Amino acid sequence: MVKNKVCLICLFLALYFLFSCKTGNSERNLPAIHLKGTILQPDSILLGHKVVAIVDSHLVVPTWKNEYLYDVYKMKGDSLLLNNRLISRGQGPYELTVSEEMYDVLSGRFVIYDCNMGKGFLLEGDSVGKMMDYTLWKSLGKFHNEVYISKMVIETDSTVVTAFMQDGFKAFLGRYNLNTGKHSILYGLWPDDGFEGSDYVKQTVYANGSLLKCPDKNLFLVSSQMGQYVEIFRIEQNQIVPVSKLFDLYPQYEVANDGLNVRYSRDNMRGLDICVTSEFIYVMPDRGTMEEYVRDIQNSDSYNYTDEIFVYDWNGVLRKRFKLDYDILTLLVDKDNHFLYGKSIDKETSDEYIVRFELDGRF
């Protein structure tokens, strides 16, 4: 009898541990490695909120300026020197009005696209010279009609994998052929979050999160915009095959009163910021719930910023937990896992700056 009770207790603990691992709770208990950051001082006002690419010791930073979409800074020691500007705002053949981007950290290529215009470019980013030469840009053409593409990542020289919204399909991932302009749907991943309403509303929740690819393997990653859901998958022919969930805290939401949009519960965790290299997945959970955010944001300019990063391999195994000495908003890691870059803020002056953290010897 005692032996049976012991077995039941062991089984309960094992199940609890497994559940905690899936939901991301157990990661909090992993000993933290503390990282010391260095502020990179810009030679001009920094009007961007993240680093999206690292090219030839240059950082590409989206800007809020009216004329251009990106500023390009050269790193010199602990300084940032404004070196160039990339992509004018407008309706011209080499212009966009707003932009999203996907950077392939291994090859240096990245896609810059405007979801509203249905237009984008593939840039060769292995050198600043190539990146700035618009004659080398490959146009993506008009990449949506009935389908609205919100995210895309490079799969091959001729295809990108997309996150999309198009009513009537229980899927939110697809493949767009750059040569033919054809968009096809990839089935096999439809998160079991309990929502039974419109397919389009559910697509909106997951198509506006993160979509990333392992630079040298047939492995991809998606996350939700709210909640804390992260899943690794691969593609076999035209089918998605789930591989591993890093977090499965699904978002809580419903159809808004207009019948089209999403209304999120204020109990939702506020999502995650993620970047990847060939070896690792860096996950930075946002701080608090939506309710806490709405309540506290008025009293703290730095509420959006956090100091904790979890590092997984592409098998879904947690490898490290980093604790930063600066709170950051977004993150990007170079292809060799040598440095991590994040946007931070001075809590007293509200000045914004980029911080660099050294990762050498941490793995």
Model-derived regions, located:
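A short helix->beta-strand "capping" segment at the edge of beta-propeller domains
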Residues: 25-47, 317
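Blade-loop segments of beta-propeller domains
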Residues: 81-111, 115-116, 137-144, 199-200, ...
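Beta-propeller blade signature
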Residues: 74-75, 171-178, 297-317, 354-361
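Structural signature of eukaryotic scaffold interfaces centered on beta-propeller domains
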Residues: 48-54, 100-106, 150-157, 203-216, ...
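Beta-strand-rich domains and repeat architectures in extracellular enzymes and scaffolds
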Residues: 39-70, 280-293
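Beta-propeller fold detector
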Residues: 31-39, 81-90, 129-141, 183-192, ...
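Short, conserved, GDST-rich strand-edge loop motifs in beta-rich repeat architectures
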Residues: 164-165, 284-304, 346-357
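Asp-box/WD-like beta-propeller blade repeats and closely related beta-sheet repeat scaffolds
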Residues: 116-118, 125-157, 163
